[in-house]
Amino acid sequence: MSKAIYLGKQALQNPPKAVEGSFLSMDGDRFYKIANYQEMKPFFMSLVSPSDHWLFISSNGGLTAGRVNAESSLFPYYTDDKIIDGAEYTGAKTIIRVLQEDQLLLWEPFSKYGKGFYSTESNLYKNTHGNRLRFEEINLDLKLRFAYEWSFSDRFGILRQAWIENLDDVERSIELLDGIQNILPAGVGS
């Protein structure tokens, strides 16, 4: 007999889901998709740059990145275990407020602290060239999709792009706070 777990009056929604992998074409590129990657233990990846940029990232979003070497990193240059542990305070951070039926609902995609409040699907995509990595979370309750991608540019260096999509036919009022955190000041060694 399986009983629901509650946090206050909110039932947590965290049934285990099967991890699946597949190739697909997206945005003119070929990607490998890992569906429900959050069910796996965090794993480490690197992105390939055509110049002197580098980026090491965990599947939970924690990362370090920079140019040339560790002494010119944008984020603290730590060992992989510390990068994995630091995902909540280093790298991408998104907080979304949705006005729905006179309620203001808070959603923080990819955060371990918000897991179970909503029914979600999480997918990870890495292109076959190894220079693009996309995180995607679909909130089935709010009918919203949020995704962000890391890549490189000769002109701009390390890039992060983000998207939000309304999957419902109903118009929504959404407030979104998005950015990166724990950036090192220029000239500070790690």
Give the ranges of each region predicted by the language model:
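Anionic coordination/interaction segments
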Residues: 1-190
